[in-house]
Design a protein with these regions (language model features):
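Short loop/turn segments at secondary-structure transitions that flank enzyme active sites
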Residues: 114-115, 123, 188-191
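Protein-protein interaction and targeting regions used for scaffolding, dimerization, and localization
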Residues: 1-27
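N-terminal export signals and maturation junctions of secreted/periplasmic proteins
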Residues: 19, 23-32, 37, 44-93
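Non-catalytic cell-wall polysaccharide-engagement segments
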Residues: 49-52, 57-64, 75-81, 165-274
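Export/targeting segments at the very N-terminus of extracytoplasmic proteins
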Residues: 61-115, 132-151
Length: 274
């Protein structure tokens, strides 16, 4: 005998409510699962981005650009690396192929311009005692208050400290032929001499010295003085090489910048090429 189940209106309402709750609950759970998946994917993507960025920041030790036997240990950006390659290219062309010699030159340039060819701009934030140490008798007649006023006007400052030195004759030569390039070429005489050596009109266009290729040509010509690259002494280590080229860059004699150039040698090493 079949049993007939009779449902009241209240029973039907409860049943329908249960079905709706079940449906909504499943949707909510599905949404939760989707959100969780999206969050995982976002987290994974962010982690990849972070790893990629960190790798890019610290990629110098693994850098395998055209630097010959010189291994870059410093944290250089792409512009600096390109300029280091330029320097090594022109050193090789001039016959400077010994890696210790190359590191000596690069260490001086690291100190002078950090591989970004530039013009001397201002000593406004340099202490008077430091300025007196750098320029000596050229500023000895100025009191501290006069020095404070002088260094606030860069053009006047360079016309004073570079007046009638290294071929400058006054009339704005100090400002016009202030330090530029990778190794901070200074003075009209040097602009003329090294411009002639590399076939560039640096006297007529001194800002040309800040072009990376020209800056590399100037630096190599300055350090070799037109001699073959193999004419340098055999250096025992990086420190000896950096000290030697710091002295050349200062015009001879023990350079006051020796310590800075020597400190920069740690940015470079010699590749173990077998």
């Amino acid at each position: 005998m079949k049993r007939i189940i009779r449902l009241t209106e209240q029973d039907l309402t409860g049943l329908l409510k249960g079905i709706v709750d079940l449906a909504l609950g499943g949707t909510a759970n599905n949404k939760k699962d989707v959100t969780s998946k999206d969050e995982k994917e976002t987290t994974s993507t962010d982690e990849k981005k972070t790893t990629s960025t960190d790798d890019k920041k610290s990629d110098t030790p693994n850098y395998n650009g055209d630097t010959g036997k010189v291994f870059l240990k410093g944290n250089f950006d792409s512009t600096q690396k390109a300029n280091i390659e330029l320097m090594i290219k022109y050193m090789n062309k001039s016959g400077i192929k010994d890696p210790l010699t190359q590191i000596g030159v690069l260490s001086v340039i690291s100190k002078e311009s950090n591989f970004r060819p530039k013009s001397e701009v201002s000593y406004a934030n340099t202490s008077n005692s430091r300025i007196r140490k750098i320029f000596g008798s050229r500023v000895s007649k100025y009191s501290d208050s006069e020095m404070d006023s002088l260094k606030k006007n860069p053009e006047r400052f360079f016309n004073v400290v570079y007046a009638k030195t290294v071929g400058n004759q006054g009339g704005g030569d100090g400002w016009k032929y202030r330090g530029r390039g990778f190794n901070q070429l200074t003075g009209k005489k040097n602009y003329e001499k090294y411009g002639n050596m590399i076939g560039r009109n640096l006297v007529g266009n001194p800002d040309l010295a800040n072009d990376p290729t020209v800056a590399a040509e100037i630096a190599v010509a300055f350090f070799t003085k037109g001699k073959p690259g193999n004419a340098f002494p055999k250096f025992k280590n990086k420190t000896e090489a950096a000290a030697h080229f710091a002295d050349i860059n200062s015009g001879g004699g023990a350079s006051r910048h020796r310590a800075d150039a020597i400190a920069a040698v740690d940015k470079f090493d010699i590749k173990d090429i077998t």
